[in-house]
Amino acid sequence: MERFPLKPVLLAVGLLASAPFAQAASTLVYCSEASPAGFDPSQFTSGTDFDASAETVFNRLTQFKRGGTEVEAGLAKSWEVSDDGLTYTFHLRPGVKFHTTDYFKPTRDFNADDVLFTFERLLDPEHPFRKAYPSESPYFTDMGLNESIKSISKTDEHTVVFALNKVDAAFVQNLAMSFASVQSAEYAAQLLKEGKAGDINQKPIGTGPFVFKRYQKDSQIRYDANRAYWKPEDVKLDHLIFSINTDAAVRLQKLKAGECQVSGYPRPADIDLMKQDPNLKVMSQPGFNLGYLAYNTTHAPLDQLKVRQALDMAIDKPAIIKAVYQGAGQLAQNALPPGQWSYDAKIKDAPYDPAKARALLKEAGIKEGTTINLWAMTVQRASNPNARLSAQMIQSDWGKIGIKANIVSYEWGEYMKRARAGEHDVMIYGWTGDNGDPDNWLGVLYSCAAVKGSNFAKWCDPAYDKLVQQAKLSSDRDERVRLYQQAQVILKQQVPITPIANSTVFQPMRKEVQDFKISPFGLTPFYGVSLAK
């Protein structure tokens, strides 16, 4: 699972909040659901952060076709793979310009040095920029790229070679993902010289379709069109604005009033109302997502399998789906969605059985009234439109078996930061696939390598991990399916998570919005989008 000067009449903050934006024909306002934690895509894993940075400001060597999962050329115009699958040679697109802003003015075009800086910074903890601005790259390590990439070199200004330690069947797809956005080496050098390395996360410079202008947390982000963009047909807006509001009801009001043209994460209960509005249209598609609970297996008593089994079978999932998803969710029984190849349809939930759950807790020596902290997101996600209500229903279910759940919430950025540090007992989370490969689920969310990243269960099972790693090394689809399905069986037996639902994705917008495409990866891209006059 992130916009730019308006006409003068709208520049005042008061007018920005109350006047319809329709009068600024080339300005699109997106009512977004949360503030990004920053603008350096390598540091994050959520759609909120990627929408505000990777999908607007940056490009990658490869990219996914808009609205699809097929990989196409990006900053690399072409590439070759060696016969042994260990060497990738990328030929870079010439003439690509980095953004010119009031805080950076590039003196050269994009070249191989920028690719080297981007990935060497991620690979090397001792890299000068990492020393000046220490930061984690959770997705990069979750994907195992820190181990699979042996070296990066350039043969000339427009040719880059990646040498791998081991075959990675999804390497080209991985480079199309948001976290692999290419940074400017020249800008990084300027920041180091100025002693402001941290600005890479606050004042982004990229080659993407929109140029960052300014950001006011919990209020708005402004971007201008990149008129020097290497793919000019994708830039059809003059200005882009993210108007941030965590309240779905407020976002709906603003959409209906014309104060924004596109709105994120609607409440399921509002969908029919939106469809009845003659000024709105609602796009939808089956979600490539999963809403789930992650049990922190390093915290007692969740380190006991019987406790996790008890909590899992005590949850009335159909009731949650009815109340929270309101017809837009499907019961999830596996740790990845049905649309993902290698999905094992034979895997089923343990029956809902509070009595057996109580017995398991007794066998595990758990006393009546034991308290567990249950974390709930404060923002809506495609995978869970109302985490707070979900938590309250789970709290009630667990209360029936003698477990007291204390619901804990934080602002989104803090929620993610603390969860990666392992402060939670149980957390509500969700994931939308990023590249169409099973490893994006079974490796990124549940592997040993991801324990410090997006594996919020902090679960590391050697037998499971061996299967996932073997599958990643194979280029034989049938062999990968066999290995991944074996891994799914282990994961279901060990209960590091409780799958809750796969949800339908709805994207409401005003009818003047043209050529918007829903991303199968849960992102909200605005390149290629226009407004009817």
Please report, for each region that a protein language model flagged, where it lies by residue:
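Detector for C-terminal structural segments
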Residues: 26-32, 52, 169, 216-220, ...
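N-terminal lobe/hinge region of extracytoplasmic solute-binding protein
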Residues: 31-84, 120, 127, 205-207
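A structural "hinge/loop" feature
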Residues: 35-52, 75, 102-106, 169-181, ...
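A bilobed periplasmic-binding-protein/Venus flytrap-type ligand-binding module shared by bacterial periplasmic
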Residues: 65, 224-228, 287-310, 314
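Aromatic- and charge-enriched surface segment that lines or borders ligand/interaction sites
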Residues: 77-129, 161, 301
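Surface-exposed binding/hinge segments that line
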Residues: 91, 123-188
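Ligand-site clamp/hinge motif
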Residues: 195-201, 227-273, 391, 404
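Structural transition elements
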Residues: 210, 296, 302, 331-364, ...
